Design a protein with these regions (language model features):
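A conserved beta-strand element that flanks and buttresses the S-adenosyl-L-methionine
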Residues: 3
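Hydrophobic adenine-recognition pocket in adenosine-nucleotide-binding enzymes
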Residues: 7
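A short glycine-rich, Lys/Arg-flanked "PGG" loop and its adjoining helix->strand segment in the class I
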Residues: 15-32
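Hydrophobic, well-ordered beta-alpha structural blocks that scaffold small-molecule cofactor pockets
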Residues: 95-176
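Short, glycine-/aromatic-enriched active-site segment of Class I SAM-dependent methyltransferases
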Residues: 33-56, 60-62
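Short hydrophobic/aromatic beta-strand or adjacent loop that forms the aromatic wall/cage
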Residues: 84-89
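Conserved S-adenosyl-L-methionine
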Residues: 72-83
Length: 176
């Protein structure tokens, strides 16, 4: 059993990883991959998911192509609610092929929805800037809590600087 839990989005050279997996895979190998789901990212407007540490996002269609490259089949697929919406696929050589669910037909709309996302981002940006500027006017630069990689996207997108944020703090022993 080979598992990838929330790491597939971090892979820069997917073809190299797939080539290495081909070497490791035997007739009895099972590969379990879980990652954030492109459909959830789009439907929940999670545009901060797209940043330098996540060069890719995945759909069920993506995993059918990955399974094909590995000469494997998707045995099972589920959509855990973790992290705002994940996809988990189980690849194997020893099972009947997974029947493509109707959910995959929704993925045909992803491209159009991605194009519409820019309007949503522009509106979010305008509203968030207005909200923060109002707070800045009342309190001055604001302290912030935590700075995960995806926060860098938001700060850059909003073009914030020390006039908006005084400092960023992390709680001791904090996991978030």
């Amino acid at each position: 059993i080979i598992t990838f839990t929330n790491v597939f989005a971090h892979i820069n050279n997917l073809n190299e990883v797939l080539d290495c997996l081909k070497i490791l895979v035997s007739r009895n190998t099972i590969i379990v991959i879980e990652n954030h789901y492109l459909g959830s990212v789009i439907n929940k407007n999670q545009f901060d998911t797209f940043y330098h540490e996540h060069p890719r996002s995945y759909s069920l269609t993506s995993f059918f192509k990955i399974a094909e490259k590995l000469n494997m089949s998707i045995k099972e697929c589920s959509f855990p609610k973790r992290y705002g919406g994940n996809i988990r696929v189980i690849l194997s050589n020893n099972f009947n092929k997974y029947k493509k669910p109707t959910k995959i037909s929704d993925e045909n709309k992803f491209y159009k929805k991605m194009l519409q996302m820019q309007k949503l981002i522009t509106n979010w940006k305008m509203n968030k800037k207005r909200e923060i500027f109002k707070l800045n006017k009342k309190y001055g630069p604001l302290p912030a809590k935590a700075f995960p990689g995806r926060a860098a996207i938001l700060i850059k997108l909003l073009n914030f600087n020390n006039k908006n944020i005084s400092a960023i703090y992390e709680k001791n022993n904090s996991k978030k």
